[in-house]
Amino acid sequence: MPQFQRTLVTTALPYANGPVHLGHLAGVYLPADLFVRYKRLQGEDVIHIGGSDEHGVPITITAEKEGITPRDVVDRYHSMNLEAFKRCGISFDYYGRTSSELHHKTAQEFFLEIEGKGIFERKTEKLFYDASACRFLSDRYVTGTCPICGNTEANGDQCEQCGTHLSPLELINPKSKLSDATPELRETLHWYFPLGRFQKQLEAFVGSHDDDWRANVLNYTRTWLNQGLNDRAITRDLSWGIKVPLQDPEAEGKVLYVWFDAVLGYVSFAREWAVLQGSPDRWKEYWQNPDSRVVNFIGKDNVVFHTLMLPAILMAWNEGRSDSIYNLADNVPASEFMNFEGRKFSKSRNYAVYLGEFLDKFPAETLRYSIAMNYPENKDSDFSWTDFQNRTNGELADTLGNFIKRSVDFTNSRFEGIVPHACSRQEWDSLGINWADTIHQLDEAFEGFHFREAVSAAMDIARAANRFLTGAEPWKAIKEDRDGAARTMALSLNLCHALSIALYPVLPETANRIHSMLGFQGTIESLFKRGVPLYKSLTEPALPMGHSLSGESEILFAKIDDAMIEPELRNIERLLAEAQAREAGATAEKMEFKPLIEFDDFQKVDLRAASVISAEKVKKASKLLKLQLQVGSTTRQVLAGVAEHYSPEEMVGKNVLLVANLAPRTIRGEVSEGMLLAVEGDAGKLYMVEPQGEKINGSSVQ
């Protein structure tokens, strides 16, 4: 791996339309903080940049629902999330906002640079327009019936019921969310970024990281590359956002699409950080100096925005330039998802534990440790209240906290709070800890983004320390061998110091409390020195004979009893009941049915038995299968949103029920001539309705 002089760490920008939950913390913000704190501990030059994504349609929809302005919405959630991050010890060097003046300026500079090179393409397209509201409708402002599953409340970008990604034009009976009127199609012009123009450059860029990027990142990215990259709109008809910076009548009423604007926050926020340092150009050292490294921490749902789209934007900027050339990301350590009690976190379904609410009840350090030990590196992991309780009580309170308190208390009471003996290197190496191997393991784990391994290796020191103190029994030995007890306590206190260093990335507050109990002035952060890695100091005992402790000790971790967890477990039962009721199409109180229809209306629906003769996946649509059906003497092509529930092989040969007289629809460039019937079961699982009987193909349902 190349040796870099400095590192810029960025974290995906949380959307300022709601509070962050534990899934966000586990996937992005805690791993980034662990990495940054490790780098600082090692004396490296690193800055940690984050901020709020404050533009986009969901924010304007929330504002309209609440009767407030979009600025009111983003102000609320920016402050809420920043405060939650601070309470959790997430150590940003700068946390910005995409609504800031400098961010607007930065995004517009990128637009003008790329526009000036003739890279963007202008395309006229037809979009829905609400005549009564006098505005074009973005996808989230259109609702209608999903052409895949029949959900009558599908959004213009995605059906929440079956998960299919849609465009507003694919909806059946579309309605405007602004007026409930049927929108009309009108022509509008938009700017497009030609991703395909950079396909070969992006393939080379991704290929250069075959050996150091995670498999999930490479797989997600190559899926897009293998399908071929298409043009992507970078402007929208919207009032809230960054104005298209052109003196052109066709640019009136248009803003930059949030996917283009948000990722440039990493640049603008670094610029804002540099201004606060009193050196406005210092940000260039991190973004444009070839000996600097950029690391983007994200969740797996954001991969292609950071491995394809942001690099393509930077490539477009760099094209033809001899100066101010941006570095592309050196690594994009995307995590998998952390689930909550076996189910995916979902803000829209209110199935989540929000960070601020959690910290109102439990200490941040216990959460940091529990999540780090369940870090979803290569596969989805799970947060459970029982696991959180067990780790807090067993590993933090009984193992780490108990060892520290016993060591400090015994020294204070029996040796006047002074390190009572010198520790030789030989004694230090005889504790059952191979310090060189431990340091190597810590370095390798942090540098490789294996945070569960890193924290576990640090906690192994606490386990070894506890075994040493328990086995030596100085409280007994002191009666006959005071010198031996003194040697034991000197080694134990030095182990306390080693733990304050080793565990600092995951437990920074606890590490500083240990540091203080050991009699040190200042904080661990005051020890940071450029080019001096503190982990290497673990190879030798640090506390000399005669060193004075503070004379005080404290319980580092209070145990969590069942009574504290019981309300959370009851709350899970309530959330699960509500989620299961929603998934079953009912409220917690009663089953709800759609409005009554006349018998003649039902008679208009032509339901036919059909059989699947072939099936294949649809490109760029992970939830769709393209099916060829035999319906009597004819064949039909139908797109069905069942790819997450049935493989193509499982569908072939099935008898199915087809809505045979549904008007054809074009979805993802493919014509769908009907709709299949399916039933949604537990956890959103779809089950095909499969008619039974002989010679029924083509027969109508009676």
Swiss-Prot record:
BP GO annotations: methionyl-tRNA aminoacylation
Cofactor remark: Binds 1 zinc ion per subunit.
Reaction(s) the record says it catalyses: tRNA(Met) + L-methionine + ATP = L-methionyl-tRNA(Met) + AMP + diphosphate
EC number: 6.1.1.10
Motif ('HIGH' region): 14-24
Alphabetized UniProt keyword annotations: Aminoacyl-tRNA synthetase, ATP-binding, Cytoplasm, Ligase, Metal-binding, Nucleotide-binding, Protein biosynthesis, RNA-binding, tRNA-binding, Zinc
Binding locations of ATP: K347
Motif segment ('KMSKS' region): 344-348
GO cellular component terms, semicolon-separated: cytosol
Annotated localization: Cytoplasm
Domain of life (superkingdom): Bacteria
Record-listed Zn(2+) binding positions: C146, C149, C159, C162
Entries under InterPro entries matching the protein: aa-tRNA-synth_I_CS, Anticodon_Met, Met-tRNA-synth_bsu_C, Met-tRNA_ligase_1, Met-tRNA_synth, Methionyl/Leucyl_tRNA_Synth, MetRS_core, MetRS_Zn
Domain spans labelled tRNA-binding: 601-702
NCBIfam families, per the entry: metG, metG_C_term, PRK00133.1
Subunit and interaction comment: Homodimer.
Family: Belongs to the class-I aminoacyl-tRNA synthetase family. MetG type 1 subfamily.
Protein name (Swiss-Prot/TrEMBL): Methionine--tRNA ligase
